């Protein structure tokens, strides 16, 4: 009996494919059942984060046919939405990102839907902004964020510039499943779409409005012009170079050294296998350059410039990486103190963080009289809180949102994390502390002295292959069927299961949070984009060593469960 995946493979092999890279790849795997099964037994699933997969031939890979199919599904949904019948598109520096962006534009144009596409790579915040600026029905960002070079992806956005809602994504997925991957999508060439006036480039007016929206969120305007901040910046061969340097120069930062090997777009990411500003390897070249130049600060943005990581210069001249939680707390503290001082703090201010981000932020928010809301993981839930404030005519109350995974936003002009404003505010904050004879390191130590030494660490456990998802499901179910009563000798005093919305007041999510008798917390959840289970630890100690020792005890106790 010939399996269905074998038949699908044969169909692709015999088709007249319009991508020269795919045919040799298909011929090469002839007779290799395991490889054919991996590529054709399943299709990439379209969810609220869109698509993400390895580049290559097959239904379980990212290629022009999977992009056409996904875009036809999106187009079918857009046609039911009325409005402008317009979709905004942007893309990052990844391999084939520009090709996939133009492919999506061709499908939309063939469906009589207008397209606004950037004429060169631009980051996530630029896509979110254009979606709102042109009052689009949807937006598409071609990116796989900080995954290795062999990946690409396709993020879909709703009309508010927020990643697509579960309901809309479910309808799009249904439409995708009705569309034959090779022949089902309507299509015209990009050139034809431009000629017919269906495809237009994003105008300079939109780009300028984005920069103005970001720069209007400075806490102490003009400060950077005289503070003399010395900066090293790396776009990690991604889309951050133009927007980040433009905004930093606009606010008065002149001394910017770009890491030369990581300056220009390069989808092969030859300097680091994982272009992720959360990890040391991605920041290593920048750190070396910071040491050489004596920079006050080193910044790195990921390929789609929605996350930013930093290293700060300490008073003793050494450099220290700063976690996403620490940067989030530093920014919250800086924005609150600065806006109170300048008289620009709104009445009843609101900040938002994800449930896995540090509780230290709660203590800081309380100190400044700010309402801090905790939402599910995924920046769209922070965007959703902004939308709720907007609907009530109170959008000015929103001052800041962050996730521990290096995502920040300090205004309602976009609805996704924005490494451009993150970079601007981090630089302004560093410049301010420099101008008063302090530093980021000193301020962070003062915060710990005031509120306690919190340590936040994440461990990831990988579950590769087709069976990986099943193992992850079984593991999470096991934690529910046989609940833990203690971890490393600490009694569990409260378990919050986010699959029970009636208990949390939030939409259902596959997340378990354990609160221990000493005030520490452990969060267990599967990753939304990778075959991993993540465990987040928040421990508290008199000093860093004590907090780290606590974390190690908890991690050792949980390791056997993840085996």
Pin down the residues of each PLM region.
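Short acidic, glycine/serine/threonine-rich loops at helix termini
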Residues: 98-103, 128-132, 150-156, 177, ...
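N-terminal small/polar loop signature for handling phosphorylated ligands or for N-terminal nucleophile
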Residues: 88-151, 249-309
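Conserved phosphate/anionic-ligand binding catalytic regions in large, soluble enzymes, centered on
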Residues: 40-60, 144-145, 231, 235-247, ...
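Phosphate-binding and adjacent anionic-ligand microenvironments
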Residues: 291, 295-297, 318, 338-525, ...
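Gly/Ser/Thr-enriched, mixed-charge loops and adjacent short helices
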Residues: 35-40, 44, 152-285, 289-290
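An N-terminal, well-structured beta->alpha segment
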Residues: 4-104, 111, 194, 199-227, ...
């Amino acid at each position: 009996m010939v399996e269905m995946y074998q038949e699908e493979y044969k169909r692709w092999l015999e088709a007249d494919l319009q991508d020269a890279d795919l045919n040799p790849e298909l011929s090469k795997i002839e007779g290799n059942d395991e490889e054919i099964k991996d590529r054709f037994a399943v299709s990439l699933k379209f969810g609220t984060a869109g698509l993400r997969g390895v580049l290559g031939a097959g239904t379980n890979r990212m290629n022009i046919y999977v992009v056409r199919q996904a875009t036809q599904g999106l187009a079918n949904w857009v046609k039911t939405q009325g409005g402008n019948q317009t979709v905004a598109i942007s893309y990052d520096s990844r391999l084939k990102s520009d090709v996939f962006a133009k492919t999506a534009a061709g499908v939309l144009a063939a469906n009589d839907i207008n397209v606004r596409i950037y004429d060169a790579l631009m980051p996530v915040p630029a896509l979110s902004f254009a979606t709102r600026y042109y009052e689009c029905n949807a937006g598409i960002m071609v990116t796989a964020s900080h995954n290795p070079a062999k990946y690409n992806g396709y993020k879909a956005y709703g009309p508010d510039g927020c990643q697509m809602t579960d309901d809309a994504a479910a309808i799009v997925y249904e439409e995708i499943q009705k569309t034959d991957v090779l022949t089902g999508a309507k299509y015209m060439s990009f050139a034809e779409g431009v000629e017919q006036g269906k495809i237009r480039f994003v105008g300079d007016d939109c780009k300028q409005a984005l920069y103005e929206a970001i720069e209007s969120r400075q806490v102490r305007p003009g400060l950077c012009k005289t503070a003399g901040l010395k900066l090293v910046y790396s776009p990690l061969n991604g889309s951050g170079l133009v927007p980040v340097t433009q905004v930093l120069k606009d606010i008065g930062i002149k001394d910017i050294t770009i890491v030369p090997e990581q300056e220009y777009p390069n989808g092969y990411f030859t300097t680091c296998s994982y272009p992720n500003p959360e990890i040391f390897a991605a920041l290593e070249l920048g750190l070396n350059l910071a040491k050489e130049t004596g920079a006050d600060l080193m910044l790195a943005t990921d390929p789609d410039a929605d996350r930013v990581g930093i290293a700060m210069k300490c008073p003793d001249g050494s450099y220290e990486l700063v976690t996403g939680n620490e940067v989030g707390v530093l920014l919250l503290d800086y924005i609150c103190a600065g806006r109170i001082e300048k008289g620009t703090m709104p009445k009843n201010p609101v900040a938002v963080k994800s449930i896995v981000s540090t509780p230290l932020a709660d203590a800081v928010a309380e100190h400044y009289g700010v309402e801090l809301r905790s939402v599910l993981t995924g920046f769209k839930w922070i965007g959703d809180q902004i939308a709720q404030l907007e609907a009530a005519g109170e959008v000015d109350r929103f001052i800041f949102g962050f996730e521990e995974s290096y995502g920040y936003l300090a205004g309602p002009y976009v609805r996704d994390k924005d490494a451009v404003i993150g970079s601007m505010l981090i630089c302004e904050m560093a410049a301010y502390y420099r101008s008063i004879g302090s530093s980021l390191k000193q301020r962070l130590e003062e915060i710990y002295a005031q509120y306690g030494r919190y340590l936040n660490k994440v461990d990831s456990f990988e579950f590769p292959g087709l069976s990986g998802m099943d193992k992850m499901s079984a593991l999470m179910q096991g934690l529910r069927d046989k609940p833990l009563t203690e971890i490393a000798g600490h009694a569990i005093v409260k378990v919050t299961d986010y699959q029970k919305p009636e208990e949390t007041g939030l939409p259902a999510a596959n997340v378990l949070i354990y609160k221990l008798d000493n005030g520490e917390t452990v969060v267990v959840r599967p990753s939304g984009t990778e075959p991993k289970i993540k465990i987040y630890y928040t421990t508290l100690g008199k000093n860093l060593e004590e907090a780290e020792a606590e974390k190690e005890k908890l991690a050792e106790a949980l390791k056997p469960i993840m085996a």
